[in-house]
Amino acid sequence: MSSSDHIHVPDGLAESYSRSGGEEGRAWIAGLPALVARCVDRWELKRDGGVRSGEASLVVPVLRADGTRAALKLQMPREETTAALIGLRAWGGDGMVRLLDHDEESSTMLLERLDGSRTLASVEDDDEAMGVLAGLLNRLHSVPAPPGLRGLGEIAGAMVEEVPSAVDSLADPEDRSRLRGWASAVAELVGEPGDRVLHWDLHYENVLAAEREPWLAIDPEPLVGDPGFDLWPALDTGWERIEATGDARRVVRRRFDLLTESLELDRGRAAGWTLARLLQNTLWDIEDGLTAIAPSQIAVAEALAKP
């Protein structure tokens, strides 16, 4: 790769790694241009457009030697990147961006190129967009679970055990009662955590337009568990748009009904595992120093409550 192709690391990505990764994160960012150059040379690639980034990864559009459009995804090696690689291999491109190659040492992935400028959020009809999500989830959940992924039982059990020491961090007694209630609901489900491969973060922004299919999922954080645990990102996605309707409860309930019917899920279990996501999110917020349950979390819980 020539000097004119030198990668400029986006400021947002550099700041994210500096904030969350400390010295190790800053060192990884400093070595990122050289890592891109090595991967381009190794796979005989050619740069093909400007880079994109999120909080954790850099995506570099490239062309393969045969002219095929692809994308390099670079992310600091972590447990999550290992899980993503396992999941991508298991799905084999079925409803998911296809893994073309990877570098195990650096966790760099060579992926098929999708249209990063067009996400599922661009679909104005919410029922239509939710139908796309449901179809993708159904395909992703149909793949047998590969070895090497964390199980939902372990994760959910740890959350329930954490509640007694975390709940007093919430200032409002009603919030403390909510958290205990969610934990009780999850405790009833821990013994049957499920055996499907879950995406964990499938929402409108993690579905991109593609060439071989209209839409494909990206950025999985796979684990093995009950499909009901995969619903919350879909229920919460585009929250500002939900609030703009003036009836968040109706929209969330409509989405829940559509998803559970399409995926043929037991509604009670799906609601319980969605409460597990609300519990998880709130415990993370408490770790970050927050003292109240986020209003959107409460709204989802109320929408799923029995009439």
UniProtKB/Swiss-Prot annotation:
GO terms for MF: aminoglycoside 6-kinase activity; ATP binding
Lineage: superkingdom: Bacteria
Name of the protein in question: Streptomycin 6-kinase
Keyword ATP-binding in record: yes
Impact when changing residue 225 to A: In strain: ISP 5236
Active site: residue positions: 201 (proton acceptor)
The entry's keywords: Antibiotic resistance, ATP-binding, Kinase, Nucleotide-binding, Transferase
Kinase keyword on record: yes
Annotated Pfam families: APH_6_hur (PF04655)
Function: The aminoglycoside phosphotransferases achieve inactivation of their antibiotic substrates by phosphorylation.
GO biological process: response to antibiotic; secondary metabolic process
Residues annotated for streptomycin binding in this entry: 133-145
Catalytic activity reported: streptomycin + ATP = streptomycin 6-phosphate + ADP + H(+)
Similarity section: Belongs to the aminoglycoside phosphotransferase family.
Annotated EC: 2.7.1.72
